[in-house]
């Protein structure tokens, strides 16, 4: 009996150690080496434009910027191509001069831009610096130069931009933040001509095969199915940047299904990091932004 008991104890000890190892592994932070990929099918297509207050001054700015867009379509395309390939070293070498505070006494001498510098390649803070760069910032600098005005860049949370720009007494001339023009936003702002059409896509972990090769309709059905497969109180969690059209899509999924949750983030990078760490299932973002995030997280 003692001999049998000893064997049993030995087996139990091995099992305890094994389960402890598994439990410890489960507590190890996920995601540090997890790569990500983009599901290519578009969930939606977005017209990207600049916004300004519904005032006489806003109308004048709209006309000026529309004329600039018409004359500089090739320049805009070149900027998107440049920023798609830009390295940290190249970004750090750029020198766009701007101030960060608008001066009421210089209202007619400054070109004041509201942005949210967390949305590459449209606008972002260059790695290891405090410099705000991006396609929108380059365009702003070129317009300010043509107008003979000093460029002012006011960086703020994305979901504060529309209200800050729309205020009748605002010093902001224009919102340049990868803004999708839509009916709701047109209630608050004038919009320029569309300067870029982007699409909304999903980012998933690279080992996630759920949506491979699917059309948009197939993706929508698959999302519903995955949500239904969640057990108990668990939900399918979709991450996106707060206040964006990406988050609007996530909310639409959640509105139609109680097993889906839309989770908002200050910027897309944080959403992707949470996905890599297993806290959410996937992220919705603009396709151009997705490319930049792929380069960042798959280094």
Which residue stretches match the model-derived regions?
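A ligand-binding cleft/hinge motif common to bilobed small-molecule-binding domains
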Residues: 28-44, 160-163, 177-188, 248-253, ...
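Bilobed "Venus flytrap"/periplasmic-binding protein-like clamshell domains
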Residues: 117-120, 129-145, 197-269, 287-291
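Acidic, polar ligand-binding/catalytic clefts
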Residues: 34-44, 141, 145, 150-226
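Extended ligand-binding regions for polar small-molecule ligands
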Residues: 42-91, 137-141, 145-146, 205-221, ...
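Hydrophobic residues within well-ordered alpha-helices
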Residues: 30, 50, 65, 143, ...
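C-terminal motif of bacterial Sec signal peptides marking the signal peptidase cleavage site
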Residues: 22-26
């Amino acid at each position: 009996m003692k001999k049998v008991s000893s064997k049993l104890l030995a087996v139990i000890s091995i099992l305890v150690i094994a389960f402890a190892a598994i439990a410890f592994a489960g507590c190890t932070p996920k995601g540090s080496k997890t790569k990500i990929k983009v599901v290519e099918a578009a969930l939606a297509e977005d017209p990207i434009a600049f916004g300004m207050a519904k005032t006489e001054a806003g109308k004048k700015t709209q006309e000026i910027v529309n004329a600039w867009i018409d004359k500089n379509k090739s320049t805009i395309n070149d900027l998107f191509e440049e920023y798609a390939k830009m390295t940290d070293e190249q970004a750090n070498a750029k020198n766009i001069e701007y101030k960060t505070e608008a001066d009421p006494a210089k209202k007619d001498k400054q070109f004041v831009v509201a942005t949210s510098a967390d949305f590459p390649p449209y606008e972002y803070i260059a790695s290891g610096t405090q410099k705000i760069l991006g396609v929108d910032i380059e365009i702003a600098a070129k317009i300010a130069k043509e107008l003979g005005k000093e460029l002012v860049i006011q960086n703020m949370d994305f979901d504060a931009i529309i209200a800050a720009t729309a205020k009748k007494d605002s010093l902001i001339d224009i919102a340049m933040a990868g803004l999708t023009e839509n009916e709701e936003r047109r209630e608050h702002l004038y919009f320029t001509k569309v300067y870029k059409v982007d699409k909304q896509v999903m980012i998933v972990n690279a080992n996630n095969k759920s949506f491979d090769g699917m059309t948009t309709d197939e993706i929508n059905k698959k999302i519903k199915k995955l949500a239904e497969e969640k057990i108990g109180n668990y939900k399918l969690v979709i991450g996106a940047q707060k206040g964006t059209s990406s988050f609007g899509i996530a909310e639409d999924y959640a509105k139609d299904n109680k097993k889906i949750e839309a989770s908002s983030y200050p910027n897309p990078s944080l959403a992707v990091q949470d996905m890599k760490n297993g806290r959410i299932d996937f992220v919705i973002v603009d396709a151009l932004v997705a490319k930049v995030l792929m380069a960042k997280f798959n280094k």
